[in-house]
């Protein structure tokens, strides 16, 4: 059986990656930096510099490399391999390498998966990613009362009970892009 980490997921629309921009998103709890190099290739990387752990989405897309904002280390498009350390410009670059993820761009959508699967097939989406789907890729804040939030959490726990088993500690509801940490929401006791 293929795990969620091995399946392709839409993480951005092509419009989210304008020239030399770095886009930040999450997939199954993994924070990602998504960017397009000047040759048009999309990169999906763990959103942490291997040097000091700073978010790479705060960095600079310099065309064929992503430059960390903190110490200026540069990582090559595609491989994520460190290619330049400003403190040692004449030395061989560090062996540091950003964790990269498989990605592809299909009909206006950027797809990624966190683990390689046995099959190397790419997502086959013949329909373009429309505005309604693209808008769901973004975060939305919806004000609601504590009573409404408790009701939503009860429904989510019921809906995902077959997947989650009997434990609801730290549940993340990711199916619609809505992430709820039940412990932080302070409503865990309400669900029991």
Predicted segments, located by residue:
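Short Cys/His-rich metal-coordination motifs, predominantly Zn2+-binding knuckles/fingers
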Residues: 28, 52, 71
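Short cysteine-rich clusters marking metal-coordination/redox-active sites
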Residues: 49, 68
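Short functional micro-motifs and their immediate structural scaffolds
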Residues: 54-57, 74-76
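Rieske [2Fe-2S] iron-sulfur-binding subdomain
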Residues: 1-41, 76-192
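A residue-level detector for conformationally permissive "hinge/kink" positions
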Residues: 21, 64, 71-72
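Immediate flanking context of iron-sulfur cluster ligation sites
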Residues: 36-44, 55-64
């Amino acid at each position: 059986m293929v795990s969620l980490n091995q399946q392709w997921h839409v993480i951005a629309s092509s419009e989210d990656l304008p020239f030399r921009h770095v886009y930040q998103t999450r997939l199954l709890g993994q924070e990602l930096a998504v960017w397009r190099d000047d040759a048009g290739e999309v990169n999906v990387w763990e959103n942490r510099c291997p040097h000091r752990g700073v978010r790479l989405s705060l960095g600079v897309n310099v065309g064929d490399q992503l430059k960390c904002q903190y110490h200026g280390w540069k990582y090559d498009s595609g491989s994520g391999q460190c290619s330049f350390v400003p403190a040692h410009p004449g030395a061989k670059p560090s062996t540091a390498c950003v964790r990269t993820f498989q990605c592809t761009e299909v009909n206006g959508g950027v797809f990624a998966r966190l683990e390689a699967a046995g099959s190397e097939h790419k997502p086959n989406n013949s329909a373009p990613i429309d505005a309604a789907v693209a808008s769901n890729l973004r975060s939305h804040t919806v004000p609601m009362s504590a009573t409404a939030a408790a009701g939503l959490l009860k429904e989510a726990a019921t809906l995902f009970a077959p997947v989650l088993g009997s434990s609801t500690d730290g549940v993340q509801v990711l199916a619609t892009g809505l992430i709820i940490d039940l412990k932080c929401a302070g409503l865990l006791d309400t669900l029991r």
